[in-house]
């Protein structure tokens, strides 16, 4: 029996009977002769590390094994087709199929199943890919390698990647003659990406460069499939199902509804996602449920990025009204001057303390109290940004007063004229009353003097006729003393009495008003005239004085008269007075207009030198001090106006008097 050894294969004359096909044996013999030496095996075996599977969509074909009627197969002389599970072919790999006559019966028994495998890395050694071996053994009865049943492995057949009706490219399948075989017939290669599903793309199995295969398949023409540049640059992004949020694996079929951007893993998720129950939202005002499909009214919430939903426009109006009320309450604040809760129009920051003023009137009071020099109209108090805005200046009593417009000047003039008329009428009435009283007193005094003079003359005539006697010596002496007054001196006596009376009245009005500059000597309660004189004539501050020390060794210093502002500017505290008699300090504004038992406004003053700086800073920022300073400034301005009016009246009176004298002489 002739034997031909090809690598690990032994071919005998009985081999055709075993295979049942002489043509297949002949072709195998030719392939064996082409190598020429047993050292060149038919199939290369590699015992290196395995190569993991791809995570492709694998289409598994369930094929019934063909029935072979040869007696050799009945005697368990079988043809074995084995393939490793971890097989990765290099280039165009080949699988020897059953005879063509059996393939026709297999087409009707093919079923399709989608399997998703996990992707594993390919282990390499020295840059060369290591492949598992796929070999064919044919043995005779009684030999070392026994025959086995025909084994169609699912893992080996799954690599064929065939699908009925789609006709994808099936790399490496060939017939015995060496031609490419596809789906049971001879066909040419299709595009390498024609088998990829629409939902995902998979990397192709390519042969690593530099690795040579010793299999007969390596002698065939090889096709290297290179991925495109776009596939090399872009990395696959993680995509999840829109319904169940499960990640879609590589190669998994995804479902998408037309016109929608959502992807789903299965039809169940697709149908359940489209029929989800709409979320109901509760209206903010009426607390009714409103479906999100309806055209709800959505408004943003203040001071946040959230939104509020309303069932209709009727619920929006009460919400807006509440917002407006809250805005109005928040915008209102308490005025520093009048202490009213109103809308603030002016804000003044002094020493990092913001004073809020509700109106122009309160602003003018605050401005006068703190000595703020601003461009404001004297009549309406409107602020003028620059001095060049208004050229309406009125000079009254040597002082320039600015106005915003001509109408304010006219109104101010009318107001001053009415005040002057009222003052002149009252002054005339007062003067007339004083004159009448003086005339009455003078008339009464003159009548009494005349009566005395008449009685004296009558007595003189009687005494001239009588003789002198001792009994009436005293009477005659008295009469002589009275008679010694000349009758022409009556008018002089009346004039001197009038002068003395006027001086007495003047002293009565002046003596209690005159006060010393020491606030410690002032009475506890000041009357109106005393307060006016102190406002007109401000007491001087004590300087260049040797201030005494107290028990702790502390004393008053002139540095307390100066206040340092936050910007470094220095201002004088003109309201702070030092009493040498009581060794204490007083607040002039609070001493004149204040009430209560504050240290700086009572009759004893403040002498806490250790905490004086803190007391002064706290006191000058208090509301009581600011109000008293406003009253002081207002009274001072009123007294100046009255003086100006009195001076004008005197000038008018003198002019009228001079005019009357001139008329008399003409």
Swiss-Prot record:
One of its GO terms (cellular component) is nucleus. The keyword ATP-binding does not apply. Disulfide bonds: none annotated. A zinc finger (MYM-type) spans 262-296, 308-348, 355-390, 401-428. One of its GO terms (molecular function) is zinc ion binding. Transmembrane segments: none annotated. Residues 87-106, 191-212 are annotated as: Disordered. Keywords: Isopeptide bond, Metal-binding, Nucleus, Repeat, Transcription, Transcription regulation, Ubl conjugation, Zinc, Zinc-finger. Functions as a transcriptional regulator. Interacts (via N-terminal 120 amino acid region) with ETV5 (via C-terminal). This is Zinc finger MYM-type protein 5. It comes from Macaca fascicularis (Crab-eating macaque).
